[in-house]
Amino acid sequence: MRTFNEKELVSEMEPIDTEICIKVNKANIHLGKRLLIKDLTFDIKEKEIMGIIGSNGIGKTTLAKALCGLSEKNLDVSYAKNKKERVKNSYLVLQDVDAQIFLDTVENELIFCKDKNSESDLEEIRNYLKVTDLWNKKTNHPQKLSGGQKQRLAIITSFLSNRKLIVLDEPTSGLDYRSMRIMSELIIKKAEEVPIIIITHDLELLFKTCHFVLMIGDRDYKKIAVKGNENMIMDFMNKKENLFKEAGYVK
């Protein structure tokens, strides 16, 4: 559990002005027959990291699943013509990663992501294992890892995939400050290649990592730059069912 002072939380990421590479147009997000989000429209730019915040049950994870083809048959997105293409062109790392980890060793889990397994591919895998403190676990069965280690493994797996969009659902839940910083640096580096969406309650991660944030309310939504809007974002988080407590912060 991390402690922080709200006044010390300042965005480290300047807004970027690159070409738009992903468009979502008037998306309606459902949970069963219930409409959670109506007419959601937003763009994502090349190299952009966009956070998504909102209270529990508002539809953030359901939106992530829709963007990645795991729900919503019809969705107007620029990176896929249909649900099958959404699955092919995107990668979602859920909070519960057990269902996404299935091979016999940590190393094989990552090797499986690569088509050719060239020396450069293997070197990339080795580097990820070392920087995330999984090198000494590379021959272990993934299901014997701790929750945080499994989470790191699943995120590395997404980085090794060749997709047009990566979506991370609460990638730092349960991580200490050092691990959060490492994950933030990895996300920023990977975003040079592919845009990344982060669903999070972690304000430290949001302010250290994201260029923009999509704030989803009960009846509306707004996408803004993180830099310069820290107070607005913190006010939004405070009002949405005490999200600081949901995130496990001590204030």
Predicted features along the sequence, with ranges:
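Conserved ABC ATPase "signature" region
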Residues: S120-K137, F159
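ABC-family nucleotide-binding domains
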Residues: D176
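Conserved H-loop
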Residues: V194-I199
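A short, proline-enriched helix->beta-strand linker immediately N-terminal to the Walker B motif
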Residues: L160-K164
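The feature captures the beta-strand-to-loop junction immediately N-terminal to the Walker
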Residues: I53-S55
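Conserved beta-strand-loop-alpha-helix hinge in the C-terminal portion
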Residues: M1, R219-A247
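Conserved ABC ATPase signature
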Residues: H141-L145
